[in-house]
Regions:
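Short glycine-enriched, charge-decorated loop/helix-capping segments at active-site entrances
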Residues: 53-58, 94-96
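C-terminal structural segments of small proteins and small subunits
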Residues: 86-118
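Hydrophobic anchor at the start of a short beta-strand
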Residues: 6, 38, 77
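A glycine-rich helix N-cap at a beta->alpha junction
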Residues: 56-85
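Anion (oxyanion) recognition and catalysis
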Residues: 32, 71, 110-111
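Short, glycine-rich nucleotide/cofactor-binding loops
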Residues: 6-22, 50-55
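Short, active-site-adjacent cap segments at secondary-structure transitions
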Residues: 47-50, 86-87
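Histidine-anchored nucleotide/phosphate-binding helix
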Residues: 20-36, 40
């Protein structure tokens, strides 16, 4: 990673009546647009952010679509495999550009990042 790097950990559920996850993705967009090497890790209830089917039909912001756009802009996005297994969600239900992650991988990302923010 470059001298300026940011890791955003999303553990909050999307579409839970708050803008927490949406703001996390807005921060990622701002960071990557500013030239900051940016990574996002989905953990706990945050893994649902990467599931296209999790978006309610009448939602104002499709968070999974925003996440996919961030990948297209160079943001690395991984999700916790253990959280997927615990929730009973199959990997096939995750958006294709997202990568399977692990606690070991998250630990490595934390070590490599200049800043870590959790939502």
């Amino acid at each position: 990673m470059s001298a300026s790097s940011l890791l955003i950990i999303i553990s909050s559920p999307p579409y839970a009546g708050t803008d927490r996850v949406w703001n996390a993705l807005r921060l990622a967009e701002t960071a990557v647009s500013s030239g900051t090497a940016t990574r996002v890790f989905l953990i706990n209830d945050g893994v649902d952010t990467g599931r296209p089917a999790a978006a309610p039909p009448d939602v104002e912001y499709n968070l999974c679509a925003i996440l996919t756009e961030l990948v297209d802009k160079g943001v690395s996005v991984r999700y916790c495999k253990t959280c997927i297994d615990r929730c009973g969600v199959g990997a096939g239900e995750m958006a294709p550009p997202l990568e399977v992650g692990s606690m070991k991988g998250l630990h490595q990302w934390i070590i490599e990042s200049d800043r870590v923010v959790t939502f």
